[in-house]
Amino acid sequence: MLVLGIETSCDETGVALYDTRRKLLGHALYSQVDMHRDYGGVVPELASRDHIRRVLPLVTQVLEQTNTSLETIDAIAYTQGPGLAGALLTGASISNALAFARNIPVLNIHHLEGHLLSPLLSDPAPDFPFVALLVSGGHTQLMHVKGIGQYKLLGETVDDAAGEAFDKTAKLLGLDYPGGKLLADLATQGQPGRFKLPRPMLNSDDLNFSFSGLKTAAALLINKQKANTQTRADIALAFEDAVTDVLVKKSIAALKITRLQQLVVAGGVGANSRLRQKLRHHLVGTGIAVFFPELEFCTDNGAMIALAGALRLQQLNEKPPGSDGSFTIKARWNLEDL
């Protein structure tokens, strides 16, 4: 079965085509980063308007790239939520219109489910069950993933998400938008051990996270020091070390509690090389396998939505009816409510 996936939850427009027999056939992505840079963050109204301009051309691009026609598509999967309401409405309306015109099923996909399943796009892929560390600009969660649609929350941030803390600290360091990747690049030039920042909730008796205090500590340190390039790099390294230390320790604790032997890391911060290195180092010789998405699938993308749609379609005893054209979005949506 061929599933077309459409992702428009925030500031990336993603389209992909997934075949349940031949895997991912093709995908295309348009990032709005340049448009939002002047504002220092995502402007929801601009994001939704740009999705309107981009979705259908990307659909055409993917169909041409894979030598496929819309008439051969068996279902359309789209991000129903969570995300920016206007952005979600764009993807939902276009997806349902296409499905209605073709009288094929439409599959409502949870954005975070797409991220959790994204490592399944790679080979080797994890088997169910596994622990998932979902870490991005909007979310920091540890999940027990038992199967498709079977997700149990183990722990989450009580304030800022890790990716949000990265971006805000990068801004304090004078880095451009989006700053998370730029902070990580700057940290590679840092001198280890010069500065020490707190590791909030590192030794708490739960699997929750907190990054607002770390962000404040970094801000105080930045204001206290002279703003030369080396000092900025040293602070960036200290901040990155603090965040990744907490993520690693909590992830290992989740593995011990669940007694599972597989860890999946997903979301934009999952691309961070220091996080990847630390997890691999700590898990060497433990028998625990760690899986990361390919770098292009760490950020929001259509491939993960097409995959999630295909896996959900395969779970059904019979093919669902074609879309009736009606739809809803869920700007806020708990993954455990699936």
Curated annotation (Swiss-Prot):
Domain of life assignment: Bacteria
Binding site for Fe cation: H111, H115, D300
Record keywords: Acyltransferase, Cytoplasm, Iron, Metal-binding, Transferase, tRNA processing
Any GO CC annotation of this UniProt entry: cytoplasm
UniProt GO BP: tRNA threonylcarbamoyladenosine modification
Presence of keyword Lipid biosynthesis: no
Record CDD domains: ASKHA_NBD_TsaD_bac (cd24133)
Catalytic activity: L-threonylcarbamoyladenylate + adenosine(37) in tRNA = N(6)-L-threonylcarbamoyladenosine(37) in tRNA + AMP + H(+)
Pfam families xrefs: TsaD (PF00814)
InterPro entries recorded: ATPase_NBD (IPR043129), Gcp-like_dom (IPR000905), KAE1/TsaD (IPR017861), TsaD (IPR022450)
GO terms of molecular function: iron ion binding; N(6)-L-threonylcarbamoyladenine synthase activity
EC number: 2.3.1.234
Cofactor note: Binds 1 Fe(2+) ion per subunit.
Main localisation: cytoplasm
UniProt-annotated binding residues for substrate: L134, V135, S136, G137, G138, D167, G180, N272
Localisation: Cytoplasm
Names of required cofactors: Fe(2+)
Entry similarity comment: Belongs to the KAE1 / TsaD family.
Record function comment: Required for the formation of a threonylcarbamoyl group on adenosine at position 37 (t(6)A37) in tRNAs that read codons beginning with adenine. Is involved in the transfer of the threonylcarbamoyl moiety of threonylcarbamoyl-AMP (TC-AMP) to the N6 group of A37, together with TsaE and TsaB. TsaD likely plays a direct catalytic role in this reaction.
Annotated protein name in UniProt: tRNA N6-adenosine threonylcarbamoyltransferase
Lineage of source species: Bacteria, Pseudomonadati, Pseudomonadota, Betaproteobacteria, Nitrosomonadales
